[in-house]
UniProtKB/Swiss-Prot annotation:
PANTHER family assigned to the protein according to its UniProt record, in alphabetical order: DEHYDROGENASE-RELATED, PHYTOENE DEHYDROGENASE
Descriptive protein name: Protein p49
Gene coding for it: p49
InterPro entries recorded: FAD/NAD-bd_sf
């Protein structure tokens, strides 16, 4: 009999399996798709030779993840590549704010009135970032905090809405860039603890950057898989699980699935009926015949580029999908240009580029024209560079990854208490009413992103139970 069976070979499922295998527990992973990866895949979606990431592409949380940093993934082929700038945010007047590795360069891009407030905000936490990241990404605490004082101070700043934190800034550049950071997890700007979201992304950039993985995000999943196999673990693909009886006998079952799917597989009825799914996105992957023709200079060397004219426009774009069930007329866009840092992603002289905007959960429209109008505001002539595009709305995203219910790439609404306490209000979020079944997906803390911490934290709960039985 196996000690543990993991369902789902995304970053969290693979990390959970690795953590258990490292401690000597026989483990096997079962994945419905033909390849491993979940939200960390790479495919040729447009033209031959253009390697696209269907979901996550830039990895500020991955390179800063305590889980990944504790594993020898570089030995198995993972290499982080850094663009000239982690992130840039252009404005209609041709200027831009930047999120640089340098706090000083970032602060200077906001202008004289906001440079000092930004420095003071960041420099309170950056020297203790590694400890803070471990404590924050282990909430609800799976162990005593290593630095409770810094964590408490961070909570005082981060738990209020991001709109409160943005009052520290007087001008629009700092406010707009920070609003865009919050929007990376599709959280409403006025929501509980959204200040913490923006701070985490900013601190992550200053600490270690916002890199891409050489060859694509698939490299992360492949490195985890190779390490797991070296530890004696097994991975089975093309294996759909509809109920626990489909799996071999094991002492523990660890599911990297949505709460809805877990309840169905484990026979838990309506246990997660109150779990809320959030807005979706409409995503476009592009093959380009040259770099994006940004008007501002800074985005040309940035790995990630945020598109929103000001914080008001961003707030409206976030409100429309969740508050009105309409797609925004001027969507806020998160864009990534991996080939700026990794020329292996496209043929010589060509580029890959992706962008997404927010839409209602389950929306079935086409946001292509609205998104490209936004891009043309900041990169005139963009459409002329397009060789091919591959679009994916909520239905296509959910078909690619069953955890994206209704196209929600955050695997659950990132708002209210569900931002921190998910999938239920509990100090033991990885446990379920079934004593042998655990959940390790992004529907558990610390939430969405390719960081493996949900799997890492869940593995702790699993091995504690295995040692007791």
């Amino acid at each position: 009999m196996l000690d543990a069976v993991v369902v789902g070979a995304g970053p969290n499922g693979l990390t959970a399996a690795v953590e258990l295998a490292r401690r000597g527990f026989p483990v096997a992973v079962f994945e419905a798709q033909g390849t491993v990866g979940g939200g960390a895949r790479t495919e040729e979606l447009t033209l031959p030779g253009f390697r696209h990431d269907p979901c996550s592409a830039a990895h500020p949380l991955g390179i800063n993840s305590p889980a990944f940093r504790g594993l020898p993934l570089e030995r198995y082929g993972l290499e982080w590549l850094h663009p000239g700038l982690p992130m840039a945010h252009p404005f209609p007047d041709g200027s831009a704010a930047v999120l640089s590795r340098s706090v000083g360069e970032t602060a200077a891009s906001f202008g004289a009135r906001d440079a000092g407030p930004y420095r003071r905000l960041i420099e309170r936490f950056l020297p203790r970032w590694d400890t803070l990241a471990r404590d924050f990404m282990s909430l609800p605490l799976t162990a005593l905090p290593r630095d409770p004082v810094t964590l408490a101070r961070f909570g005082l700043v981060g738990l209020p809405p991001s709109t409160w934190l943005m009052r520290r800034f007087r001008d629009e550049k700092a406010k707009t860039l920070f609003a865009g950071l919050v929007a990376h997890v599709m959280a409403p700007l006025g929501g509980f603890a959204t200040g913490a979201i923006g701070l985490v992304f900013a601190l992550a950039a200053h600490a270690r950057g916002w890199p891409v993985a050489r060859g694509g995000s698939q490299s992360i999943s492949d490195a985890l898989t190779a390490y797991l196999k070296d530890l004696g673990g097994a991975v089975h693909t093309d294996y759909e699980v509809k109920r626990l009886d489909d799996l071999p006998p094991a002492r523990a079952y660890v599911l990297d699935t949505s709460p809805t799917a877990l309840a169905r597989i484990a026979g838990l009825g309506s246990h997660y009926a109150n779990y809320r799914y959030g807005p979706s996105v409409f995503k476009i992957d592009y093959a380009l015949d040259g770099p994006v023709p940004w008007t501002a200079e800074e985005p040309r060397s940035a790995g990630t580029v945020q598109i929103g004219a000001d914080s008001t426009e961003i707030g409206a774009a976030l409100h429309a999908p969740s508050g009105t069930d309409r797609a925004p007329e001027r969507p806020f866009l998160i864009t990534v240009q991996p080939s700026v840092a990794d020329p292996t992603r496209a043929p010589a002289g060509k580029h890959v580029f992706w962008a997404y905007g927010h839409v209602p959960n389950g929306w079935n429209g086409d946001l292509t024209d609205a998104m490209e109008r936004q891009l043309e505001r900041f990169a005139p002539g963009f459409r002329d560079r397009v060789l091919a595009r591959a679009t994916a709305g909520p239905a296509e995203l959910a078909a690619r990854n069953a955890n994206y219910v209704g196209g929600d790439i955050s695997s659950g609404a990132v708002s209210g208490l569900q931002l921190l306490l998910r999938p239920k209000i509990s100090l033991f979020p990885y446990s379920t009413p079934h004593p042998a079944v655990f959940i390790c997906s992004s529907a558990t803390p610390p939430g969405p992103g390719v960081h493996g911490m949900s799997g890492h934290n869940a593995a702790k709960a699993v091995w504690r139970r295995l040692r007791q039985t």
